[in-house]
Amino acid sequence: MKRIISAAVTAGFSLLPGNMTAARAADITVLSSNGLKAAVVELVPQFEKETGHKLVFTWGASNLLVKQIEGGEAFDVVIVTPALIKNLVKQGKVVDGSAVDLARVGVGVAVKQGAPKPDIHTVDAFKQTLLNAKAVAYTTAGQSGQHFIGVLEKLGIAEQVKAKAKTTPGGAVAEFVAKGEADVAIQLIPELASVPGVEVVGPLPAEIQTYIVLTGGIGTNAKDKVGAQALIKYLKTPAAISVIKAKGMEPG
């Protein structure tokens, strides 16, 4: 929870037709998975300019964000995995029928900028890369982190990697690589690519890859459901889809 990053991004003019001014447009509070951060941050200024809304973000691992919601955190829009959205609907915290798939993203590998890129094209090569690394960085939270932990067990090297792991419950694990504290980092590709000083080697081999779907939903107690819906619709526009693709994701 400590590593969940909060950020507010500002700008704007007006959302609703006619004479609604920027001064009257409501803030929209968004709790979003780190996986969509690189794309959304780039899209925010234009959305705010067109609508007059200010977007106020809390970024983090999906499961940690849900814990915040279950603890009473107020929000207008939440962007996490479909299963978590479904549970929030059951709890009455997300409007039933408001869920929209926004993006699909895979897990990748990153190294420090300028460092030799290891072979990760096959499962055996990836396994050897992990064994050769002096330190491996990965997250212990979120669907991608849990998937990687499962991969380590499947490959039979969980204990070897755990002994030299650099882990965090949330945030950008590629920072360990950028600072020279780990040789490789494993996380969702957009999260890796967003860290200065690192290079994405590529995705995990197909046999052990997983794709995380990120879904947006509107809070039952959202301050401005119309504004929340406008944001979700904006993230499905051609302009937004273009940015999502450019950040290494597939549109939902």
Please report, for each region that a protein language model flagged, where it lies by residue.
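Dinucleotide-binding Rossmann-like beta1-alpha1 core, especially the glycine-rich loop
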Residues: 75
